[in-house]
């Protein structure tokens, strides 16, 4: 897919947010609604307690979860307003390589499940030198993060 000028702008903003991450793999995410950015974030080490569904049983906070969490709390738990907003929201998900360029940024299984649960309208990401735009309900992945794989292996010891 070739990004429009507006999509290119949003994806660039997402990539800029990825550079703020202190993690080994730097991910960023921008949420847009009505052509405007409504939330932005990047992946971080988890440094707070879990009081919501976005951070339970996790050692880090993914960029997508950071953004969904911000939208959720922005609406003060007003479910009707959240549902209406999420149904019209597009997430631009990026990953910044060591040389500063965009690299594979498809959401992991856990993030995709949360994106689907919150009825996000579209996701845009970079994979194998191409950009993709999907309705999250039409997208499937088996991608697990290194952290998830490590935690799974620990539970089998």
Where are these regions (language model features)?
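Intrinsic disorder/low-structure terminal segments
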Residues: 9-10, 32, 145
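Zn2+-dependent cytidine deaminase-like catalytic core
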Residues: 4, 39-157
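Short beta-strand scaffold segments in enzyme catalytic cores
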Residues: 26-41
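Short, basic/aromatic recognition patches
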Residues: 1-26
